[in-house]
Amino acid sequence: MAEAAGVPAESLAGCRARAARTVLDQVVLPGEELLLPDQEDGDGPGGAGERPLRLNAAARSRGRVVCGPGLRRCGDRLLVTKCGRLRHKEPGSGSGGGVYWVDSQQKRYVPVKGDHVIGIVTAKSGDIFKVDVGGSEPASLSYLAFEGATKRNRPNVQVGDLIYGQFVVANKDMEPEMVCIDSCGRANGMGVIGQDGLLFKVTLGLIRKLLAPDCEILQEVGKLYPLEIVFGMNGRIWVKAKTIQQTLILANILEACEHMTADQRKQIFSRLAES
């Protein structure tokens, strides 16, 4: 214990820090600090060729670094706050930087700013609607947060309606706040979802899988029946087909496809297409 007490804090911090490029697509744990390679200075605290990730003006020439879910800025480093796999997406310009986030598996949804979610209106308090989004507390939604809404022209929102919107405020110290308009004031598909259709819940991992650009599941589902579908990052899916039977079939397929292989999905889709 005496030897451990004599170790400088800087040495302990250096032991915790790891190079982000060496742990991409690997499991990271809460409390770990991430470093990125710095070509300008090879003698950093992370070892040869590594130094702390700079998030100030000095790093702008190397590209902007965006801190996604599961990561938090801690001085000039990134601190891991969730257990999961570290992911990275290169910027379109190819100038370095990009988006870093932790792909984690969790049951309860934690609101994230910019996420599009499906909520259920549970109450109306003055000019504010309370919306259940599956988090630890309901989100607030102003009646002015709809396209074309004014004090005289109020949106027709009732308790029990389904709302598709996005978060503009989402952090641990404030109540989540939703809007149904984009930065240009347009609805862009957001607002009250139709009365018909079926709402069901899936895992957060399946939602991310279905929303991936190279997802083949949606392409195969779209060939079966004409449908309307809305995905919420909070694990909720709303789907509507021509008949109730088709709607139930689509919901069952989407729920079951998470644990299916590609061959199993092809067999099911071929059988449904024949019938």
UniProtKB/Swiss-Prot annotation:
General function of this protein: Non-catalytic component of the RNA exosome complex which has 3'->5' exoribonuclease activity and participates in a multitude of cellular RNA processing and degradation events. In the nucleus, the RNA exosome complex is involved in proper maturation of stable RNA species such as rRNA, snRNA and snoRNA, in the elimination of RNA processing by-products and non-coding 'pervasive' transcripts, such as antisense RNA species and promoter-upstream transcripts (PROMPTs), and of mRNAs with processing defects, thereby limiting or excluding their export to the cytoplasm.
Compartments where located: Cytoplasm; Nucleus, Nucleolus; Nucleus
Principal place of residence: cytoplasm
Cellular component per GO, a single term: nucleoplasm
UniProt cross-link Glycyl lysine isopeptide (Lys-Gly) (interchain with G-Cter in SUMO2), position: 151
Keyword Ribosomal protein assigned: no
Gene Ontology terms: biological process: CUT catabolic process; DNA deamination; exonucleolytic trimming to generate mature 3'-end of 5.8S rRNA from tricistronic rRNA transcript (SSU-rRNA, 5.8S rRNA, LSU-rRNA); isotype switching; nuclear polyadenylation-dependent rRNA catabolic process; nuclear-transcribed mRNA catabolic process; poly(A)-dependent snoRNA 3'-end processing; positive regulation of isotype switching
Transmembrane segments: none
Modified residues (N-acetylalanine): 2
InterPro entries in alphabetical order: Exosome_RNA_bind1/RRP40/RRP4, KH_dom_type_1, KH_dom_type_1_sf, NA-bd_OB-fold, RRP40_KH-I, RRP40_N, Rrp40_S1
Protein name per the record: Exosome complex component RRP40
Keywords associated with the record: Acetylation, Cytoplasm, Exosome, Isopeptide bond, Nucleus, RNA-binding, rRNA processing, Ubl conjugation
Assembly information from the UniProt record: Component of the RNA exosome core complex (Exo-9), composed of EXOSC1, EXOSC2, EXOSC3, EXOSC4, EXOSC5, EXOSC6, EXOSC7, EXOSC8 and EXOSC9; within the complex interacts with EXOSC5 and EXOSC9. The catalytically inactive RNA exosome core complex (Exo-9) associates with the catalytic subunit EXOSC10/RRP6. Exo-9 may associate with DIS3 to form the nucleolar exosome complex, or DIS3L to form the cytoplasmic exosome complex. Exo-9 is formed by a hexameric base ring consisting of the heterodimers EXOSC4-EXOSC9, EXOSC5-EXOSC8 and EXOSC6-EXOSC7, and a cap ring consisting of EXOSC1, EXOSC2 and EXOSC3.
GO MF entry, a single one: RNA binding
Native source organism of the sequence: Bos taurus
CDD domains listed in its UniProt record: KH-I_Rrp40 (cd22526), S1_Rrp40 (cd05790)
SUPFAM superfamilies hit by this protein: Eukaryotic type KH-domain (KH-domain type I), Nucleic acid-binding proteins, Ribosomal L27 protein-like
Family: Belongs to the RRP40 family.
